[in-house]
Amino acid sequence: MHRYRSHNCAALRKHDVGKHVRLSGWVHRVRDHGGILFVDLRDHFGITQIVANPASPAFEIIEKVRSEWVIRVDGEVCARSDEVINTVLPTGEIEIFVKEVEILSKSDELPLPVFGEPDYPEDIRLKYRFLDLRRETMHKNIMRRTEIITAIRRSMQNNGFTEFTTPLLTASSPEGARDFLVPSRIHQGKFYALPQAPQQYKQLLMMSGFDRYFQIAPCFRDEDPRADRLPGEFYQLDVEMSFVEQEDVFVTMEPIMRSIFEEFANGKPVTQNFPRISYDEAIKKYGSDKPDLRNPIIMQDVSQHFYDSCFKIFAQILTNDENAQVWAIPAKTGGSRAFCDRMNLWAQSEGQPGLGYIFWREEEGKFEGAGPIAKNIGEQRTEALRIQLGLESGDACFFIAGNPKKFSTFAGAVRTRIGEELDLIDRECFSLAWIVDFPFFEWNEDEKKLDFAHNPFSMPQGGKNALECQDPLTLKAFQYDLVCNGYEIASGGIRNHSPEMMLKVFNLAGLSREVVEDRFGALYRAFHYGAPPHGGMAAGVDRIIMLLQGVKNLREIALFPMNQQALDLLMSAPSDVSSAQLRDLGIRVAPAAKNGS
């Protein structure tokens, strides 16, 4: 018999009754029922119940074991009586009457419980992550993560993609966040950078004559953490294809993404044909470029009802600013003064002056609007608003006025808040859509210059002619995002493969030819030697797994994550290094940095 086990702790069934077996694992819990000891023995695969009575030669040792000790047991498989069968466990019809026990490893007093999975402070969980990962939910999360990544790889390979591994030590380049820098010992005073994304490498693979690339790529960005973004390191499904247009990417990647969601959605419906929504439409209807389409609320421009109205606040805003609009945010079933007042208080807590609103009631077969706005704009305009918005008795609507560029984000937050408060959001589905036609540039008011709105390597719609003839702020890019349930889960684009257009695009953003050649020299050179049209995308693996597992925090689906302060509490990183190491690198740490100031 094997030194440690003949079976794992999930393998034995009723047909194994009578067998002499050997199991090894962790003591999940111990129970004493009338002098008979019951031990739940746990390993990676599951749990088997071990039984020891006072007559067993192993009883004296079993009495001593405690939670999370590691033991080996030898014994006989016996059938449980019908009244004590555990239908929750696959092994619930049997138990092992123990004959021999060996203690393989003892455990100190636990800093957090493994059995029962109560809430526990996150910093303790991260410091003792090896214990946290023994808990059933966390263990399942990590195994599901592996299953999803395996399914992604299989699907990509089945669709003709080849997996390549790109370097982790590269040159620093601006990708929208700070780089993690790695000092060079051989070339003192110079630094490598960990890649924020394999953007240039994957494009260079297309220059190298490869056709369809993918990689589950580690990416490193020194940015502030959020619940839906891990500090430091994250993983993305990186994809690039040669000789493609935007539609080719959609036709190829949409079935792959849909199949992954369907395989791991636990029966929840998944969008079959992903709608294409322009960036401008997404902002106007949903107040976000990553709309949650499970929320049925669609915002509308209702400015025409407020021009020259007696609701002077909105009328003056429209008169004083030609770009001003009034947006309506319908709230089906929200037609009570209490709810409207609650929303108003919430808006004020968000730093806003408040929310205008109307709610409707039906009196003697006639709809009546209530609230300050209805009182000021009159019955005719109030009814016209109700008809346009498709509202009924018991419904409400909230209003925001001003320049949409300034209030659209808040309007989107109002839409989300209403959907959550009124339970309008369908929590039992995955709603996916492509967001397309992103603006190429945006205006940086602080620096009085153009910035890239998205990826600087994308192809401008209209090509070279548009670059030369159009107002840069009206340019659209062949740039797209894939969104799901209010999260951006992928981003991509058709790439610019012309060196002349590359220079023109970066010149518009204030970067000279010399800067482009310095920061993106490899890509710029490659464009001079026969560059194929190409495009692709990158999908956030961690975020997709988070959605499929139904958790709110990425740390729940990552093995050894940092905390919110970008500290690795398990490995005590970042850490001090020795003076000798610093001397080898030609680095001296400033006194202020040593003191943490």
UniProtKB/Swiss-Prot annotation:
GO molecular function, one term: nucleic acid binding
Reactions performed catalytically: tRNA(Asx) + L-aspartate + ATP = L-aspartyl-tRNA(Asx) + AMP + diphosphate
UniProt subcellular location: Cytoplasm
Assigned protein family: Belongs to the class-II aminoacyl-tRNA synthetase family. Type 1 subfamily.
Top enzyme category: ligase
Keyword Ribonucleoprotein in annotation: no
Principal subcellular localisation of the protein: cytoplasm
Keywords from the named record: Aminoacyl-tRNA synthetase, ATP-binding, Cytoplasm, Ligase, Nucleotide-binding, Protein biosynthesis
Enzyme Commission number(s): 6.1.1.23
Pfam families for the chain: GAD, tRNA-synt_2, tRNA_anti-codon
Cellular component aspect of the GO annotation: cytoplasm
Organism whose genome encodes this protein: Bartonella quintana (strain Toulouse)
Positions of the UniProt region annotated as Aspartate: 199-202
Site positions for Important for tRNA non-discrimination: H33
Biological processes per GO annotation: aspartyl-tRNA aminoacylation
Official protein name in the record: Aspartate--tRNA(Asp/Asn) ligase
Function according to Swiss-Prot or TrEMBL: Aspartyl-tRNA synthetase with relaxed tRNA specificity since it is able to aspartylate not only its cognate tRNA(Asp) but also tRNA(Asn). Reaction proceeds in two steps: L-aspartate is first activated by ATP to form Asp-AMP and then transferred to the acceptor end of tRNA(Asp/Asn).
Residues holding L-aspartate: E175, R221, H454, R495
InterPro entries xrefs: Aa-tRNA-synt_II, aa-tRNA-synth_II, aa-tRNA-synth_II/BPL/LPL, Asp-tRNA-ligase_1, Asp-tRNA-ligase_1_N, Asp/Asn-tRNA-synth_IIb, AspRS_core, GAD-like_sf
Assembly description: Homodimer.
Residues annotated for ATP binding in this entry: R221, D222, E223, E488, G540, V541, D542, R543
